[in-house]
Amino acid sequence: MQTINSKSLLRCAVAGLTIVAASAVSFGQNYRNSDDAFLPSPVRSASTVPSNGDVNPYGVAFIKNNFLTGSGLLKHGDILVSNFNNAQNLQGTGTTIVRIPQSGSPSLFFHGNAPLGLSTGLGTLQYGFVLVANLPTADGTSGTAQAGSLLVINNQGQLIQTITSPQIDGPWDMTVVDEGNRASVFFSNALNGTVSRINFSVSPAGLRELSHYTIASGYLHQGDPAALFDAPTGLVFDQNTNRLYVASTLDNAVFIVRDAKSRTTSDGPGDVVYQDNAHLHGALAMAEAPNGHLLVTNNDVINSDPNQPSEIVEFTKWGQFVKEIPVDPNQGGSFGLAVHKVSDDTSILAAVDDNTASITIWTLPLN
């Protein structure tokens, strides 16, 4: 157990949390990287509230090095955050995506026209497109939720396509498999408790749907005044095994759907890989760490525990708990997160805090 893969990504994050105060300007100006340094890199926090006042940050995505930035607003290493609520804090009414640069102040990347509710489903394609799932409501309640759509935004921050499909029914989260001229997008649907896959061809002109399938179904789902929906949410696709990991909030468990990229029929909910009432409190958004572990946030509505607020839980793909850390001292803060491997030695973990409408960014050594 001496390899990098056996170590906890969150171990370094916990250490980083203890020196948040040290990331003030005076420290940052004097900080120098060193291979034998003990102290982790400073923890950074940024507001996700744009000028129109949108709140409740949900989706998180990195602009990777293969993204075609062109002359657009985005730069490699930027972080994007989608907002689900408007300035009146009505769920399913947020219309903005905020850009968090590697240095400098956040700025507005995209402002769409209502009705929109930009959910946790946020991703990118190397052609220079940003994809965001849209689950709008009329008044912030689940009773007025609509089927929604997938928005395709170019690197200039301009909406170029709005895609609807029978396989998009309240898109609560998604994950994107980017293969250049082709892409597969997996959606978790809050309105019917299913997971679907839409295959696209991709060109500079945009996306064209090739086929669509429901590949998993039967997840518990319900409307919830606090969270809008308790439903299947976080998705992680494992290219090596062709398996899709699904975090289902109301089931409070993580499932495996086998043959996810090739199957054309539903596998039911798949098989439970991780169910842990001691650490899971409404399994929500999910990301994969560079060590192969999975990271899942919790909505704190299901199996609530005030002594474990706003946790990110790290566990192995065979269902063994590793570690947990909070993103907020109060319940209800954790939601979207993403991990970006910068180099063989360094990764970045970014996680939103819905309570404070902010994002926390950790730079973590992998060795």
Regions found by a protein language model. Give the residues of each.
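Beta-propeller domains
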Residues: 69-70, 83-108, 192, 199-201, 213, 221-268, ...
